[in-house]
Amino acid sequence: MDKKMRILCEVCLGDKNIDKLINEIRSNIRLKEASVPKCRSMITNIMEKNLEKLSRPPRSREEIEKLYFYLNTQCVNNIIEIIAKKYPNLHVNKKKNACKEQMKRDLDTWGNRRNHVLDRPFIKPRRENSDDEDEQQDGPKNSDFGFMGHTSDSQYASPFENHSITNLPIGQKQPFNNPHQSNRNTSDFESRLQQYMNERDYDLPRNQPPPEIDFTLDHSGEKVMKEKLMRKMGAQSGMNGMDDMGGVCGFNGMSGMNGVGGMDDFYASILGQGSPMAQEGSLGSLNPMNLMTPINRNNQMNPMNQMNPMNQMNPMNQMNPMNQMNPMNQMNPMNQMNPMNPMNMGNQNNQNGIPFMGMGNPLMSVSSTNLMNDQMGYGGFGQSEKNIQFQNDLEKKLAERKIMDLETGQRPEQSAYNDMQSHQMMGSLGSMMNPMGQMNQMGQMNQMGQMGQMNQMDPMNIMNPMNLMNQMNQINSMNQMPMNQMYCNMPNTINC
């Protein structure tokens, strides 16, 4: 007998191995102590028969180990089958929750084989990597079920975990809804390469273009690039109107598109007041497309212009006959159409996009006191969008009432509030009805751009002795006439 064959026989027929097989049989069969010697003899006989069936001796140590485990398994299964057929009541049923009727039904249905359970279908998720750096997504990818891949060992079906199947051994990963572990083998070079790239490229900065070289002699190229960058950022965020604070493009009347981009609500500007951003000094109110000029907006929204009795009741602002009847203010064609007239600078700004925008001194684009009012909060900074919309509707109704009264020849009822609202509305009504921005008879003196706007907030006009001491015109019958409360009179213009 070969040496390796002799070693295999000694190991399989040894007392230690036989005792091990008896303990394994007793775990499946209720075996009494008196039946142990008979079981030992059965194990020896079956093992000898199986050894004789071998066609050749083992050739290596690995084959000896494989034959050892195989012969032990065959011996135990044969003895359990013999005893279970002869003594069925001695067989230990390890199916805890299965009754005899269920066992018989499975036997009649499927026969002597494992229960056939259909696996849930699995679709391999498509690759979601892209060559585009902007659209590349690192980390776990979505599966075809619409959820992220998970790796937990849950034994129940859950949309946020792995799906469970019934015929999978306990401890093995479930393949469903887990694209990271499903359909993967050691030879899948492409998937391992993609995983490696995701791990290495995670949270790494992208390649940035090199900075542009400043070739200008006065080193002004850096400033120009900063201005372009700020305009680009403003266009992307829709907040071009905030550039007013920096003076980059807020008061640059030559860039026509900036004014359009500053309006976040175009329909609100059509109603007359402009966008809500326009009340914060943005470009919405300065846009030539806007029906409300910044001067009229200050007339309506500025509380110092609405409630200040110096502006409402001052005879120099309201009741001065020079503002009412002077042909230079109402009918002078040089004030209406002449673009070179410095008194009509604000009106021409709305037509030609001149950088001064009618905000004060034409030599300094941001020298107007009104700009400070808008930025510091006096130009309607605290107005809410609902209040602005309500005031727009009210002004439209008052304008319609005023037009109806003028057409029918009736005298409207006068009151302090009606006078104030009608005074505010006449300037905006004139700008809406006159598409060319010409001066009309009711309120377009607000368009005069050089020094007339200083009547709004200029302390020289508020504290002017001519405005404070002139009490004779307060009791004048002209006090009841609906005039624009922000008229720019000639004495104030001269004083400025």
Curated annotation (Swiss-Prot):
UniProt organism field: Acanthamoeba polyphaga mimivirus (APMV)
Polar residues composition bias: residue spans: 151-187
Start and end residues of each stretch annotated as Disordered: 118-187
Biased composition range(s): Basic and acidic residues: 118-129
Name of the protein described by the UniProt record: Uncharacterized protein L357
